[in-house]
Design a protein with these regions (language model features):
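Ser/Thr/Asn(+Pro)-rich, low-complexity disordered segments
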Residues: 1-206
Length: 206
């Protein structure tokens, strides 16, 4: 491949911090696997470490705001104007941005941007199952919101002032998804206890 950007749209022809975070999460897992390997494996781990250190998370604050933005374009700048707030699949982006050894963001970016100073907290029930967080644009959210941030990050024991247990929250979000498919209020063909899992396939139309 050429290494050039393949834009999703006219103005989405530059950096994408969310997808970068997903990629980096996987690469860091590879780094940990190979770091003590043979010479080729150590060389691969070193290349990954350099990529990790090169990601400029701080740039995506769009002028030192206490929030991270999804897109930046070399031709359109910040015109897509998409600051990211929780909760959704993007938590890993804020965690990696805070953890960066070279371009780390201050804690206020997580608290003000992601958690919106506590507005992310909204205890409620969906399908009779307890959830603790407010999900963007929906009561619960699709299954990938429970998955993507934890492909390389273990949620067991993970908590903060906004959520007493990210493991239990994501488990319950998964159970909500399953319960909805079993109830199948819109009578979709095939939905049931053996056919469930609405991940990146949902839409505003149901």
């Amino acid at each position: 491949d050429t290494g050039k950007v393949k834009p999703f749209g006219q103005k989405d022809n530059g950096g994408d911090l969310v997808e970068t975070a997903f990629l980096m999460q996987g690469l860091l897992a590879v780094h940990q696997y190979y770091i003590n390997g043979n010479e080729k494996e150590k060389a691969l781990a070193a290349r990954i470490d350099q990529i990790w250190k090169d990601v400029d998370w701080n740039w995506y604050r769009n002028g030192d705001q206490n929030v991270l933005y999804w897109h930046w374009s070399p031709t359109y700048g910040w015109e897509m104007d998409f600051p990211i707030h929780g909760y959704n699949e993007c938590m890993i982006m804020y965690i990696l941005a805070a953890a960066s050894p070279t371009h780390g963001v201050p804690a206020a970016v997580y608290h003000d941007g992601w958690a919106q100073n506590g507005a992310i907290v909204s205890p409620h029930k969906v399908e009779g199952i307890e959830l603790h967080l407010r999900y963007q644009g929906t009561e619960a959210g699709p299954l990938f919101w429970a998955q993507y941030s934890f492909l390389g990050l273990d949620p067991v024991g993970l908590k903060d002032e906004y959520c007493p247990s990210y493991f239990h929250e994501m488990r319950n979000l998964t159970l909500v998804n399953r319960a909805y498919c079993i109830r199948n209020p819109k009578h979709y063909k095939g939905f049931g206890p053996d056919c469930w899992g609405l991940t990146a396939s949902y839409s505003v139309d149901g």
